[in-house]
């Protein structure tokens, strides 16, 4: 494993992968599915405090779903995602396409049975550069026009901008579907 994972718990490793905005995170109270779109509904809110190991533990244990804003206070990102809201989605075919194109991506099932396709980076990069690269990759995969995270290329910290969060994978890691 990379040096920054050595000696860390699974929760700490997960938190290291999903670094982003430090001063707030998203929370979701899961509701019913929309009958027409099949998108999972729920009540989303911003929790205006830093994430902790306990926050990530609760997510992984299936107690409280959380989301992270990929862009940090310095307008840098170490991960991003392509949000594919297509139902039904053939996840196996998508993974095969990623493998065929030899793209360094991780495909995860979203809460609505779409996909979040993650790109993790070794070092932080400008949000704008990551966003442009993910748009290019989405088009290459045949999903041009999908939502891209980070959604913002710049946060004005002095104004209190928080950006948009993405729900993290592995909610209820032992018994969940994502």
Question: Which role fits each region the language model picked out?
Answer:
Residues 103, 113, 164:
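Residue-level signal for beta-strand positions within conserved beta-sheet cores that form or flank
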Residues 7, 109, 138-139:
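Short, structured coil/loop segments at alpha-helix boundaries
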Residues 107-116:
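Short, conserved phosphate-binding/catalytic loop or strand-edge motifs used
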């Amino acid at each position: 494993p990379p040096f920054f994972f050595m000696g860390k718990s699974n929760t700490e490793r997960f938190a290291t992968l999903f670094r982003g905005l430090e001063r707030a995170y998203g929370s979701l109270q899961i509701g019913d599915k929309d009958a027409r779109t099949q998108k999972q509904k729920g009540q989303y809110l911003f929790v205006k405090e830093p994430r902790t190991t306990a926050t990530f533990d609760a997510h992984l244990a299936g107690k409280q779903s959380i989301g992270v804003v990929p862009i940090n206070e310095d307008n840098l990102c170490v991960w991003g995602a392509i949000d594919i809201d297509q139902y039904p989605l053939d996840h196996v075919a998508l993974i095969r396409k990623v493998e065929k194109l030899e793209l360094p991506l991780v495909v995860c099932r979203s809460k609505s049975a779409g996909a979040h396709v993650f790109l993790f980076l070794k070092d932080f990069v400008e949000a704008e550069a990551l966003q442009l690269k993910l748009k290019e990759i989405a088009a290459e995969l045949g999903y041009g026009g999908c939502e891209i995270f980070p959604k913002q290329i710049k946060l004005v910290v002095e104004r209190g901008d928080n950006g948009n969060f993405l729900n993290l994978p592995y909610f209820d890691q032992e018994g969940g579907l994502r």
